[in-house]
UniProtKB/Swiss-Prot annotation:
Keywords: Cytoplasm, GTP-binding, Nucleotide-binding. GO terms for biological process: negative regulation of canonical NF-kappaB signal transduction; Ral protein signal transduction. Belongs to the small GTPase superfamily. Ras family. KappaB-Ras subfamily. This is NF-kappa-B inhibitor-interacting Ras-like protein 2. Signal peptide: none annotated. GO terms for molecular function: GTP binding; GTPase activating protein binding; GTPase activity. The keyword Cytoplasm applies. In contrast to other members of the Ras family, the members of the KappaB-Ras subfamily do not contain the conserved Gly and Gln residues in positions 13 and 65, which are replaced by His and Leu residues, respectively, and are therefore similar to the constitutively active forms of oncogenic forms of Ras. This suggests that members of this family are clearly different from other small GTPases proteins. Atypical Ras-like protein that acts as a potent regulator of NF-kappa-B activity by preventing the degradation of NF-kappa-B inhibitor beta (NFKBIB) by most signals, explaining why NFKBIB is more resistant to degradation. It comes from Xenopus laevis (African clawed frog). Pfam families: Ras (PF00071). The gene is nkiras2.
Amino acid sequence: MGKSCKVVICGQHGVGKTSILEQLLYGNHVVGSDMIETQEDIYIGSVETDRGVREQVRFYDTRGLKDGLELPKHCFCGTDGYVLVYSVDNKDSFKRVEALKKEIDRSKDKKEVTIVVLGNKSDMKDQRRVDHEAAQQWAKAEKILLRNGPTHGSANWNLHPDH
Protein backbone atom coordinates (compact mmCIF):
# COMPACT_ATOMS: atom_id res chain seq x y z
CA MET A 1 0.00 0.00 0.00
CA GLY A 2 1.36 3.42 -0.95
CA LYS A 3 0.90 6.67 0.91
CA SER A 4 -2.27 7.91 2.57
CA CYS A 5 -4.09 10.98 1.24
CA LYS A 6 -6.55 13.33 2.92
CA VAL A 7 -9.47 14.52 0.79
CA VAL A 8 -12.10 16.90 2.20
CA ILE A 9 -15.64 16.72 0.77
CA CYS A 10 -17.54 19.98 1.27
CA GLY A 11 -20.49 21.98 0.04
CA GLN A 12 -23.81 23.44 1.05
CA HIS A 13 -26.24 21.53 3.25
CA GLY A 14 -28.30 18.91 1.38
CA VAL A 15 -26.40 18.71 -1.93
CA GLY A 16 -25.58 15.00 -1.63
CA LYS A 17 -21.99 14.86 -0.34
CA THR A 18 -22.52 11.77 1.81
CA SER A 19 -24.67 10.08 -0.84
CA ILE A 20 -21.93 10.50 -3.46
CA LEU A 21 -19.29 9.13 -1.09
CA GLU A 22 -21.37 6.12 -0.08
CA GLN A 23 -22.20 5.32 -3.70
CA LEU A 24 -18.62 5.66 -4.96
CA LEU A 25 -17.06 3.71 -2.08
CA TYR A 26 -19.70 1.12 -1.28
CA GLY A 27 -22.26 1.24 -4.10
CA ASN A 28 -25.09 1.32 -1.60
CA HIS A 29 -26.79 4.71 -1.70
CA VAL A 30 -30.56 4.38 -2.12
CA VAL A 31 -32.19 7.33 -3.91
CA GLY A 32 -35.03 8.73 -1.85
CA SER A 33 -33.69 7.42 1.45
CA ASP A 34 -34.03 9.71 4.46
CA MET A 35 -31.30 12.31 4.71
CA ILE A 36 -29.41 12.28 7.99
CA GLU A 37 -27.49 15.45 8.72
CA THR A 38 -23.75 14.79 8.84
CA GLN A 39 -21.69 16.32 11.63
CA GLU A 40 -18.40 14.98 10.30
CA ASP A 41 -17.38 11.48 9.24
CA ILE A 42 -14.23 9.91 7.89
CA TYR A 43 -14.44 7.26 5.18
CA ILE A 44 -11.39 5.24 4.24
CA GLY A 45 -11.01 3.82 0.76
CA SER A 46 -8.30 2.14 -1.25
CA VAL A 47 -7.80 3.62 -4.71
CA GLU A 48 -5.63 2.42 -7.56
CA THR A 49 -3.78 5.31 -9.17
CA ASP A 50 -3.02 5.69 -12.86
CA ARG A 51 0.50 4.44 -12.01
CA GLY A 52 -0.96 1.13 -10.77
CA VAL A 53 -0.18 1.87 -7.11
CA ARG A 54 -2.85 1.40 -4.42
CA GLU A 55 -3.21 4.34 -2.08
CA GLN A 56 -5.31 4.74 1.03
CA VAL A 57 -7.57 7.78 0.85
CA ARG A 58 -9.20 9.30 3.93
CA PHE A 59 -12.33 11.15 2.84
CA TYR A 60 -13.45 13.77 5.37
CA ASP A 61 -17.20 14.16 4.89
CA THR A 62 -17.94 17.59 6.35
CA ARG A 63 -21.13 19.05 7.78
CA GLY A 64 -23.25 20.74 5.14
CA LEU A 65 -22.56 24.45 5.22
CA LYS A 66 -25.43 26.81 5.92
CA ASP A 67 -25.45 30.61 5.84
CA GLY A 68 -22.72 32.07 8.00
CA LEU A 69 -20.83 28.79 8.47
CA GLU A 70 -17.31 28.40 7.15
CA LEU A 71 -15.25 25.29 6.65
CA PRO A 72 -13.61 24.29 9.96
CA LYS A 73 -9.92 25.24 10.16
CA HIS A 74 -8.76 21.62 10.59
CA CYS A 75 -10.01 20.97 7.05
CA PHE A 76 -7.07 22.95 5.71
CA CYS A 77 -4.29 21.14 7.62
CA GLY A 78 -2.44 18.50 5.62
CA THR A 79 -5.17 18.23 3.00
CA ASP A 80 -4.16 16.76 -0.37
CA GLY A 81 -7.41 17.47 -2.17
CA TYR A 82 -10.91 18.87 -2.01
CA VAL A 83 -14.15 17.74 -3.60
CA LEU A 84 -16.58 20.66 -3.75
CA VAL A 85 -20.17 19.52 -4.29
CA TYR A 86 -23.17 21.52 -5.49
CA SER A 87 -26.63 20.54 -6.66
CA VAL A 88 -27.53 21.58 -10.21
CA ASP A 89 -31.06 22.41 -9.00
CA ASN A 90 -29.78 24.95 -6.45
CA LYS A 91 -27.96 28.08 -7.64
CA ASP A 92 -27.02 29.06 -4.08
CA SER A 93 -25.15 25.78 -3.69
CA PHE A 94 -22.98 26.70 -6.69
CA LYS A 95 -22.33 30.15 -5.23
CA ARG A 96 -21.23 28.36 -2.04
CA VAL A 97 -18.77 26.27 -4.10
CA GLU A 98 -17.34 29.47 -5.62
CA ALA A 99 -16.90 30.91 -2.11
CA LEU A 100 -15.33 27.67 -0.85
CA LYS A 101 -12.80 27.74 -3.70
CA LYS A 102 -11.76 31.26 -2.65
CA GLU A 103 -11.58 30.19 1.00
CA ILE A 104 -9.37 27.22 0.08
CA ASP A 105 -7.09 29.44 -1.99
CA ARG A 106 -6.66 31.78 0.99
CA SER A 107 -6.26 29.11 3.66
CA LYS A 108 -4.56 26.06 2.20
CA ASP A 109 -1.28 25.10 3.83
CA LYS A 110 0.19 23.65 0.63
CA LYS A 111 0.72 25.33 -2.69
CA GLU A 112 -0.46 22.29 -4.66
CA VAL A 113 -3.78 20.69 -3.80
CA THR A 114 -6.18 19.00 -6.16
CA ILE A 115 -9.68 20.46 -6.34
CA VAL A 116 -12.55 18.70 -8.10
CA VAL A 117 -16.05 20.14 -8.36
CA LEU A 118 -19.04 17.81 -8.66
CA GLY A 119 -22.45 18.99 -9.84
CA ASN A 120 -24.89 16.49 -8.35
CA LYS A 121 -28.44 15.66 -9.52
CA SER A 122 -27.74 16.35 -13.21
CA ASP A 123 -30.58 13.99 -14.16
CA MET A 124 -33.08 16.56 -12.81
CA LYS A 125 -33.02 18.52 -16.08
CA ASP A 126 -36.39 20.23 -15.56
CA GLN A 127 -35.23 21.61 -12.22
CA ARG A 128 -31.72 22.71 -13.28
CA ARG A 129 -30.85 26.16 -11.93
CA VAL A 130 -27.09 26.16 -12.52
CA ASP A 131 -26.14 26.74 -16.16
CA HIS A 132 -23.79 23.96 -17.23
CA GLU A 133 -21.76 26.11 -19.63
CA ALA A 134 -21.32 28.91 -17.08
CA ALA A 135 -20.16 26.39 -14.47
CA GLN A 136 -17.68 24.87 -16.94
CA GLN A 137 -16.33 28.33 -17.85
CA TRP A 138 -15.83 29.14 -14.16
CA ALA A 139 -14.03 25.82 -13.58
CA LYS A 140 -11.81 26.41 -16.60
CA ALA A 141 -10.90 29.91 -15.37
CA GLU A 142 -10.11 28.46 -11.91
CA LYS A 143 -8.12 25.60 -13.51
CA ILE A 144 -10.12 22.89 -11.76
CA LEU A 145 -11.99 19.81 -12.94
CA LEU A 146 -15.80 19.95 -12.95
CA ARG A 147 -18.03 16.91 -13.51
CA ASN A 148 -21.80 16.44 -13.35
CA GLY A 149 -23.51 13.26 -12.22
CA PRO A 150 -27.04 11.96 -11.73
CA THR A 151 -28.92 11.43 -8.50
CA HIS A 152 -29.30 7.70 -9.10
CA GLY A 153 -26.74 5.13 -8.02
CA SER A 154 -25.29 4.28 -11.43
CA ALA A 155 -23.29 7.50 -11.58
CA ASN A 156 -19.99 7.30 -13.41
CA TRP A 157 -18.31 10.51 -12.35
CA ASN A 158 -15.32 10.05 -14.70
CA LEU A 159 -12.93 11.90 -12.41
CA HIS A 160 -9.74 11.35 -14.39
CA PRO A 161 -8.59 14.79 -15.57
CA ASP A 162 -7.68 13.56 -19.06
CA HIS A 163 -11.29 12.68 -19.91
